[in-house]
Regions:
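A generic structural motif
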Residues: 210-214
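C-terminal reverse transcriptase regions that engage the nucleic-acid substrate
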Residues: 148-152, 156
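A residue-level signal for conserved active-site and pocket-lining positions in enzyme catalytic cores
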Residues: 117, 150, 478
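Non-transmembrane amphipathic alpha-helical segments
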Residues: 113-127, 146
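Inter-lobe coupling/hinge region of RecA-like P-loop helicase motors
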Residues: 159-172
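DNA-dependent DNA polymerase catalytic subunits
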Residues: 1-109, 128-138, 142-146, 166, ...
């Protein structure tokens, strides 16, 4: 951790090590209590003296044990000179890699997989340019599948059943990725501050494993409603400038933080590309956001992209699946709170007064009802169906698809009311709903909580909005709990 922190400070000429620790050092490495305790006092450092009092101990794998290598280095500069002399590469978790060897098998596999992904992406973009969205979506799925396979190659090194399992290599991959993306975030922010003639403004909204999302506010002044392809190209040019600057900086990072001294385009797998341009986005939490893109890889293209937000869960009734997407689209189209409230209120009214029981019941599967050791809500409801409503053994639930709904009161079953039972599951066939329609009073408060409140509450919180009184006044569940929480996140334009 000390080595990486010092190398970060030297590469970016940061005299404030607290900033380097908080903003750039991989979170994976922030567990050295001694470093955490001393970090506040390590300000205004002298780069020439940095690391001179650092003692570094080395432990060698069997292949290198008999090469008469030093076991201790008395300063950072001594360690760095040893890396350079032997053409070794340093990973942020402390692993040293011999660069004198030929291409490793894992990097060769990754290289081959990436080549196949490039072919799919080229075909995908050709279809997008032609306006053939159906075939574009097909090849987008293909290239995404190849990307997932590629990522799995990295992850499998941490699986002890994998033939080439090596936890140190796996940690090295994780920490290297974290350090690079956090370093690139720092470089992007610094560059955009120069373009905007500002100081210490945070242009980066969020970063992820392999991506950075940043805003161009105060750099470009076109309306967010802009759809002109030429203007979008002009805006994306700023993004390209940022990417070119970062990609140039990556070579310096690799040489000065990892000591990959022979880094060049032929042996570097990491390079950033401009994937999309969006006119709006809402950011709920880490890896949980939605954006409305208007330009994708150089081509005008509009689409809502949710990340970490499931708009159409399999457990959501079919009748309500368009609702959440409609809310998000209107939010990202900058509709007013009053307009969004109206959508919410209308859906609540439809749930109570328009939809039938079977339309709002939650779909789910049952796998051998007697095998459940605990009692999930749909199994609880299935047992009530079997014992009180099934008219024959053929009607009973054992396996298969069911739908469950919350019950406020059983109209002609005192025992179920006395026992406090509150749910009924019904086999997924329309005819069975006739058995219960006149025998239950639906708990619409709970159904509203489950189907409407939970999905939209995060959006309202991020926007610093309160839910409409027309909905909350008659509800005692999640609505009122939410109303008492303090929202912290806000919508951001990108």
């Amino acid at each position: 951790q000390w080595i990486v922190l010092y190398l970060i400070a030297k590469e970016f000429k940061l005299t404030d090590l607290k900033y380097a620790f908080d903003e750039i050092l991989p979170k994976y490495l922030e567990y050295d209590l001694d470093l955490v305790e001393k970090i506040d006092s390590l300000n205004n450092v002298d780069f020439k003296e940095l690391g001179n009092n650092l003692i570094i101990n080395a432990k060698y794998f069997k292949l290198y044990e008999d090469l008469n290598q030093p076991e201790t280095f008395n300063s950072l500069s001594e360690f760095v000179n040893w890396l350079k002399k032997n053409n070794y590469c340093f990973l942020p978790n402390g692993v040293v890699v011999d660069q004198n060897k030929g291409d490793a098998i894992i990097s060769k596999v990754i290289s081959d997989v990436m080549e196949s992904r490039k072919k799919y992406k080229k075909i995908m973009l050709d279809y997008l340019e032609q306006g053939n969205i159906a075939m574009y979506n097909v090849y987008d799925t293909y290239q995404t599948a190849v990307k997932l396979i590629n990522n799995a190659v990295y992850g499998v090194t941490a699986n002890e059943k994998f033939r080439l399992f090596n936890i140190k290599i796996s940690e090295g991959i994780t920490t290297t990725g974290q350090l690079l993306i956090r370093s690139c975030t720092h470089v992007v922010n610094k560059y955009l501050n120069e373009l905007a003639n500002t100081k210490d403004k945070d242009f980066v909204i969020t970063n992820d494993t392999d991506s950075i999302i940043f805003t161009l506010q105060n750099i470009v002044n076109h309306p967010t409603s802009t759809k002109d392809p030429e203007i979008l190209k002009e805006i994306s040019e700023y993004s390209r400038m940022c990417i070119d600057h970062v990609n140039t900086s990556i070579y310096s990072m690799c040489k000065n933080m990892f000591y990959k001294t022979n880094a060049n385009k032929s042996n570097m797998f990491l390079s950033l590309k401009n994937e999309w341009l969006a006119n709006s986005g809402i950011f709920i939490a880490k890896k949980c956001y939605a954006i409305h893109i208007v330009f994708k890889e150089g081509i005008p293209y509009e689409k809502l992209i949710p990340k970490g937000i499931s708009l159409k869960k399999s457990s959501t009734p079919k009748a309500l699946k368009p609702f959440l997407e409609n809310v998000l689209n209107n939010i990202l189209d900058f509709k007013s709170k009053e307009e969004i409230d109206k959508i919410l209120i209308e859906e609540c009214n439809k749930l109570k007064n328009v939809y039938k029981f079977k339309d709002i019941a939650l779909p789910i599967s049952v796998n051998d009802i007697e095998s459940y050791k605990n009692l999930p809500i749909h199994i609880r409801g299935a047992k009530i169906w079997n014992s009180h409503f099934a008219q024959s053994d053929f009607d009973k639930i054992n396996t298969g698809k069911v739908k469950y709904i919350y019950v406020k009161r059983w109209k002609d079953n005192l025992k179920l009311n006395m026992d406090g039972e509150y749910v009924i599951s019904v086999p997924d066939q329309d005819k069975y709903w006739m058995y219960i329609e006149d025998k239950i009073e639906v708990d619409y408060d709970k159904m509203l909580d489950r189907l409407i409140i939970k999905p939209v509450s995060a959006f309202y919180s991020a926007l610093n909005w309160e839910l409409p009184n027309a909905v909350t006044s008659n509800n005692t569940g999640v609505f009122n709990i939410f109303m008492n929480t303090k929202p912290s996140l806000k919508i951001k334009l990108i």
